[in-house]
């Protein structure tokens, strides 16, 4: 196993329960926005790549024929199975695996999605090409991730790498769009949605190195006057 995958396993094994319970992660309107943007319907078969606790898979499963989630972290898949059971969904499959080499045939799914993942990938183009490989001709590929402004991306990445050591690099929207071109895909349709999150909630599902929390809090506070991390951070109370 690569050292980066080891960091992923370490972080997301510990994050599995708090991540799945976070209001910002489980935001129903955000999940519905992705499902709607994908044009999902009763004839679709869906793959969600690096599915985490399965929230998006379950959202898709309520409207499609079948939904599959794959993830590297067994603890995340355990939370995903709990979510499936709680929602009474029978049309779901969970697979354990590395998303850089998806264990599915070519042209197998009509929708292939990926949420809050690309900033954790060392080579997102490899994963996008795999997503394209397993997607049927005429299917839809959906990538949802943070997309900071070009002049603010470095500040955001510095904070995120401190908060979550498995974070690699968030990309500006133009760079994300460029990945589709490099993967031989059509120009993507771009939509935006905003999810609000309390800093305490964010830190409760993060496991930074010992002693770094105060520095992270200061980075958020210092970013407020100029919105230097492009997170629209504000102070309350």
Regions found by a protein language model. Give the residues of each.
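Class I SAM-dependent methyltransferase SAM/SAH-binding core
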Residues: 47-49, 53-101
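A short acidic, Gly/Pro-enriched loop at the edge of an enzyme's catalytic core
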Residues: 100-111
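A short SAM/SAH-binding and catalytic strip from SAM-dependent methyltransferases
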Residues: 110-122
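A short glycine-rich, Lys/Arg-flanked "PGG" loop and its adjoining helix->strand segment in the class I
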Residues: 125-137
């Amino acid at each position: 196993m690569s050292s980066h995958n080891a960091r992923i396993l370490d972080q997301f094994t510990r994050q599995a329960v708090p991540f799945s319970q976070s209001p910002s992660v489980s935001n129903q309107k955000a999940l519905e926005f992705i499902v709607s943007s994908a044009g999902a319907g009763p004839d679709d078969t869906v793959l969600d790549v690096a599915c985490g606790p399965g929230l998006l898979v379950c959202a898709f499963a309520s409207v499609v024929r079948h939904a599959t989630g794959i993830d590297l972290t067994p603890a995340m898949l355990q939370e995903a199975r709990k979510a499936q059971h709680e929602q009474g969904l029978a049309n779901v499959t969970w697979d354990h695996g590395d998303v850089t080499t998806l264990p599915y045939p070519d042209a197998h799914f009509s929708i292939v999605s990926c949420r809050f993942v690309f900033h954790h990938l060392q080579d997102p183009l490899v994963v996008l090409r795999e997503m394209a490989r397993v997607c049927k001709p005429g299917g839809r590929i959906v990538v949802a991730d943070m997309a900071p402004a070009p002049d603010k991306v470095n500040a955001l990445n510095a904070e995120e790498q401190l908060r979550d050591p498995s974070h690699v690099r968030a990309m500006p929207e133009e760079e994300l769009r460029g990945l589709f071109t490099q993967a031989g895909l059509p120009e993507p349709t771009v939509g935006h949605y905003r999810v609000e999150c309390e800093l305490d909630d964010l830190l409760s599902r993060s496991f930074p190195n010992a002693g770094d929390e105060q520095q992270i809090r200061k980075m958020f506070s210092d970013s407020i006057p100029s919105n230097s991390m492009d997170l629209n951070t504000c102070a309350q109370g």
